[in-house]
Amino acid sequence: GQIKLAQLHLGRAEFGGVPTNLQREMENAGVLIRLNTSVDPDLARETVPDIVVIATGALPYPAEIEGLEEAHVVNAWQVLKGQANIGGRVVIADWRCDWIGMGLAELMARNGCHVRLAVNGMTAGQTIPQYALDAWLATLHELGVEIISHIRLLGIDAEDAYFQHTLNSHSVVLSEVDLF
């Protein structure tokens, strides 16, 4: 499921072929695939499998911050699927410092949004291999994405996002925001 989402990031269409390729590989290997099947001891005794792989799917990670009910908040999945009403001034709080925050920042900036990418690490994308990271940071710079490092999201309200600097514990407020 998340592979289908990954292909929606700009420049990541290659992920679109992964499910088909994996399905073909499993068919070639003679793997029996059962979808939407409850797994219990009776099924295991009946089928006597060599191995069982349970794919349970995923859900977006829910933000647990103060002010959710006051602000316009969406998750990455909604943005990628085109299900989000995105304003012109966006703050992305990226606690993972990986592909997702940078991909969303690029997508929204290319769609005309003023984007501030707030990360709690040393830099946006710090978990991405260096050769890819440098080029992507350059792209975000060219698009005017403002990257603010070392800040952790604490709360939000209708127009502001409240952060704590992770190195000195000072308060950081990002104002005039339409979307979080």
Where do the PLM segments sit?
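A Rossmann-like FAD-binding core segment of flavoenzymes
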Residues: 15-61, 70, 75-81, 85-86, ...
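Beta-rich extracellular carbohydrate-active architectures
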Residues: 66-67
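Beta1/beta-strand and adjacent pyrophosphate-binding region of the FAD-binding site
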Residues: 86-98
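N-terminal Rossmann-fold NAD(P) dinucleotide-binding loop
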Residues: 101
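Short glycine-enriched, charge-decorated loop/helix-capping segments at active-site entrances
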Residues: 5-12
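Short acidic/His/Gly/Ser-rich catalytic and metal-binding motifs that mark active-site loops
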Residues: 1-3, 62-63
